[in-house]
Amino acid sequence: MAARHFLTLNDMTTAELEDLLDHASKLRKEWRSGQTRDTLKNRVLAMIFEKSSTRTRVSFEAGMTQLGGSAMFLSPKDTQLGRGEPIEDSAIVISSMVDAVMIRTFAHETVERFATASSKPVINALTDEFHPCQLLADMQTYRELRGSIRGATVAWIGDGNNMCHSYINAAERFDFRLNVACPEGYEPDQQLIEQHADRVTVVRAPEEAARGAQLLVTDVWASMGQEDEQKAREKAFRSYQINPALMAQADKDALFMHCLPAHRGEEISADMMDHESSAVWHEAENRLHAQKALLEFLILNRLD
């Protein structure tokens, strides 16, 4: 049987995604009640990091351990995909020794090429184009706190980046409307917008995007690798901050989410992390449980 990969949300059907999120919620309850699992006993996850991340490493490594398996960390010094050895050669060799491979890198093409040659499941833990693992955590969090997101309105405030792209995919998979508020020149990928034009609206005013929304989401103004653009981005995004005033435009029961790390005083006001609408800490923990469910699904080809 050919390996299943998770490079974008489109690699799973809506039914598969919803089953996975239900299982993730079950895993969260088990873990919080002290139950243990060994469904991935003696299984090994290779974690290739060309972009560093606290949450990604901790959640995947802890997740494999909690399921009875293990994870190995490979830094840029250990791998250097495509520099010296072709990506495809690395994929063939690494996948012959482990049970799954997680990659966090820059170019989305890197994970696509790796997956094509890999005999084991490949997980996109973030590229410059997509961040599907975070969307699993976000959708799990919304379901746990508010129920089904079907028919809801979600407002993305800020840069049309990889997180925004994954929210566009999620709008189709989970059947919600997405309003994207961003300054000119920072829009999401135009082809992606056109493919989902029936669900996605791009506007300039954050207030317009947030009006009546059930979920407000944002990310940093300058992502990793864009540090030299920081000043220009601060100027462009100055009015694209999620704060209590913007939350007041949303539905009275609206949630606020952020994938972290958050820059207080920039994309969010200092008081938003602990605002009554904030689901950020719940969302952050769910990276662990959503990814455990994903690992079981891909490695075992089932959800126990």
Curated annotation (Swiss-Prot):
Pathway: Amino-acid biosynthesis; L-arginine biosynthesis; L-arginine from L-ornithine and carbamoyl phosphate: step 1/3. Pfam families: OTCace, OTCace_N. L-ornithine binds at residues 162, 219, 223-224. GO terms for cellular component: cytoplasm. Signal peptide: none annotated. It catalyses: carbamoyl phosphate + L-ornithine = L-citrulline + phosphate + H(+). It is found in: Cytoplasm. Transmembrane segments: none annotated. It comes from the Bacteria. The keyword Plastid does not apply. One of its GO terms (molecular function) is amino acid binding. Belongs to the aspartate/ornithine carbamoyltransferase superfamily. OTCase family. PANTHER family: ORNITHINE CARBAMOYLTRANSFERASE, MITOCHONDRIAL, ORNITHINE TRANSCARBAMYLASE, MITOCHONDRIAL. This is Ornithine carbamoyltransferase.
